[in-house]
Amino acid sequence: MSTAPRRALLVIDVQNEYFTGDMPIEYPSVDISLPNIVTAMAAARAAGVPVIVVQHDAPEASPIFAKGSDSWQLHPQVAAFPADHRINKVMGSAFAGTDLRAWLESHGIDTLTVIGYMTHNCDAATIYHAAHDGLQVEFLQDATGTLPYANAGGTASAEEIHRVFSTVFHSNFAAVVSTQDWLAAVREGKPLEMDNIYLSNQRARQAQAN
């Protein structure tokens, strides 16, 4: 019999920049992700799962997330939530330069559920950090989101970035599920399983061969 996970819900950078600033989240739409973020937070509170809210700080001269600016502020629906712990960070990973790891250890947490923004940046950095530290990780793919990029390395739509990172996460770093599937797992006290790199690759090879 599997042991019930000791979860914490990590809400990453749900800040106004992604809603009304110059870097709007495009996929999934915030009309999808924000309600799921709020739903997950409320469900966590009801189930006794600690909720940790993370906010990114940038220098006052920064064009995005300048500390004290409107774009830096948490979205009102997240700001008003009575979180169990709050973290301000200056790097991608919510672990880097913060007390997150110590807080999780002091509360006996073995499973970290990641929601918020952006899939490929702060979510990814945090997921990799958590997985390498030995935590079980969950990623709610409809309570997160991203935006498009174009640079010397190439171009990618928001949908492409979100889909590819979700696929990679599930292959080796985090169980990728919907908010509804996560709610069911929380109610039932069950762990969520990720795939592995071998099977993920073999399925793709078989699909290509067909």
Name each model feature, range by range.
Residues 2-8, 35-42, 64-210:
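Active-site-adjacent betaalpha module
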Residues 5, 23-52:
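A short alpha/beta connector and helix-capping loop motif
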Residues 9-14:
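N-terminal nucleotide-binding beta1-loop-alpha1 segment
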Residues 17-20, 147-149:
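Short acidic/His/Gly/Ser-rich catalytic and metal-binding motifs that mark active-site loops
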Residues 18-19, 52-57, 77-86:
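Short, basic/glycine-rich phosphate-binding loops at helix/coil junctions
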Residues 23-30, 62-65, 154-155:
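Short glycine-enriched, charge-decorated loop/helix-capping segments at active-site entrances
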Residues 47-64:
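Short hydrophobic interaction/assembly module
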